[in-house]
Regions:
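Asp-based, Mg2+/Mn2+-dependent phosphohydrolase catalytic module
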Residues: 1-6, 18-19, 85-87, 112-231
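N-terminal helical cap/lid subdomain that shapes the substrate entry/recognition surface
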Residues: 2-109
Length: 231
């Protein structure tokens, strides 16, 4: 059966996420040092300790990254001596600073050209566990929909996000393929939901997951020819 729907992961599939997150964390700490001086430019390690405490108490927060980030900031501010009425607006403002920096991504060179070409022949969608918004990245025109774990309440590799994507597009699992970098979240998750899968592996790493993807690419520009060969 021919492919009608292509879903994409975002982080580490359309851009390298590590430098983005490093910069966003640094931007947030600098902002806190200026606007929340009782807390100061808090070490990221301290925020990770708070994160672990919150997740231990409420594991479902791992699927709600924006809420988790706000709660981390709120707790850090309160522990530094800020009252709730002071901490809440500071936490929200700090989160917005972080989120803006988190969207300062450098797309892989072939992203726009590849998505434009594919969008002419297939429905495209996004399935992400992160909180990047394609509308803020200038990519919304290519995608029919974007599904994120925060809105669904569950993330990859659970089958639900993939099943929701199939329903959104009105296609069967055999007519869909998911592309991503993560062996478990993307490849195993897609397989469990009955989709075909393509492993995006730009660094040529050895496979260390379970059942392999149906195909592997090192550049997104390889996708049009690969998908055409499946017709």
């Amino acid at each position: 059966m021919s492919i009608r729907l292509i879903t994409f992961d975002l982080d580490d599939t359309l851009w390298d996420v590590a430098p983005v997150m490093h910069s966003a964390e640094a931007t947030l700490r600098a902002w806190l040092g200026e606007h929340a001086q009782d807390l100061g430019a808090v070490p990221v390690e301290h925020l990770w300790v708070i994160r672990a405490r919150l997740l231990s108490a409420e594991p479902a927060l791992k699927h709600r990254l924006s809420e988790l980030r706000k709660r981390i900031l709120l707790l850090a501010l309160q522990e530094a001596g800020y009252s709730a009425s002071q901490a809440e607006p500071l936490a929200e403002a700090g989160f917005q600073v972080f989120l803006a920096a988190r969207h300062q991504v450098t797309l892989f060179p072939d992203v726009h050209a590849t998505l434009e070409q594919l969008a002419n022949h297939y429905q495209l969608g996004v399935i992400t566990n992160g909180n990047a918004d394609v509308r803020r990245l200038g990519l919304a025109e290519y995608f029919k929909f974007a599904l994120c774990a925060e809105e669904l309440g569950i993330g990859k590799p659970d089958p639900l996000p993939f099943q929701r994507a199939l329903a959104q597009a009105g296609v069967d699992a055999e007519q869909a393929v998911h592309i991503g970098d993560h062996p478990s979240d993307d490849i195993a998750g897609a397989r469990a939901a009955g989709l075909r899968s393509i492993w995006f592996n730009p660094l040529g790493k050895d496979w260390n997951g379970g059942e392999r993807a149906h195909a592997e690419v090192q550049r997104l520009s390889e996708l049009p020819a690969l998908l055409a060969s499946w017709r």
